[in-house]
Design a protein with these regions (language model features):
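Conserved SAM-binding loop of SAM-dependent methyltransferases across substrates and taxa
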Residues: 165-178
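Conserved Class I S-adenosyl-L-methionine-dependent methyltransferase catalytic core
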Residues: 1-12, 16-17, 41, 45-155
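A short acidic, leucine-rich amphipathic alpha-helix
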Residues: 26-33
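Conserved SAM-binding loop
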Residues: 194-195
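Conserved SAM/SAH-binding beta-strand->alpha-helix loop
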Residues: 187-189
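Conserved SAM-binding strand-loop segment of SAM-dependent methyltransferases
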Residues: 202-214
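Conserved class I S-adenosyl-L-methionine
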Residues: 153-164
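Conserved SAM-binding motif I beta-strand of class I
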Residues: 180-185
Length: 215
């Protein structure tokens, strides 16, 4: 149940609005996010009862209570660029739940359930912040021979197998300006998203993606 309410907070931008705009009443948060006050009030009260939010004055009336996102919760619930960010788990739970009827049918038929579609929730980017913050800055530099080769001439060409939406490829290209990276994945939707991500990162010239079986 908590993760389902986290899904709402992530999907509707409620956490980011509290983090960026500071404490708010239910009406203020609804105005910031283009949502309905009555529903937002229920979400705020539930989150306060569960300890995810704090209330300035619990004795205040329902419409006067101001809710805040504690500083220690911001990296986990509001900052998508932080390696501790976890709000995407609510999205993944909702997305996975849509496929459960097909899983139940597979129990009866012995077949395989179809792959989960991305719509309407989208694909949680579980590894995005970790790759962008750690792969090229800590993990690869911790392997001296690999780090040296990636920095040296002639420029290395790297194959990134099962690259998903491309964040590992992008992180390597950002950390090592000489290299080129070829990402491969079976998931054509992921490859399409990876191409967009590389374009937005300004790396389309050095990072390419192909939907292919690399086995």
């Amino acid at each position: 149940l908590e993760l389902l309410t986290v899904y709402l907070g992530e999907r509707l931008g409620l956490y980011q609005a509290l983090s960026a705009g500071g404490p708010a009443t239910s009406a203020e948060l609804a105005a910031r996010t283009g949502t309905v006050e009555r529903y937002v009030r229920e979400w705020l009260e539930h989150h306060a009862a569960s300890g995810l939010l704090e209330v300035d004055d619990p004795a205040a009336g329902p419409l006067d209570r101001r809710y805040r996102l504690p500083p220690g919760h911001v990296p986990v619930l509001a900052d998508t660029g932080d390696v501790r960010y976890q709000a995407f788990n609510g999205t993944e739970i909702v997305r996975a739940a849509r496929g459960m009827p097909q899983v139940a049918e597979a129990f009866r038929s012995g077949g395989a359930p179809p792959p989960l579609t991305w719509a309407p929730e989208g694909r949680p980017e579980f590894n995005r912040a970790v790759f962008l913050n750690l792969l090229g800055r800590q993990w690869l530099p911790a392997i001296p021979d690999v780090d040296l080769r990636l920095r040296a001439e002639p420029p290395a060409r790297v194959a990134d197998l099962a690259c998903g939406t491309g964040w590992s490829s992008i992180a390597m290209a950002q950390a090592y300006p000489l290299i080129s990276v070829d990402g491969f994945d079976l998931d054509s939707d992921a490859i399409e998203a990876a191409g967009r991500n590389a374009q937005e990162a300004g790396l389309a010239g050095r990072v390419t993606f192909t939907a292919a079986d690399a086995s």
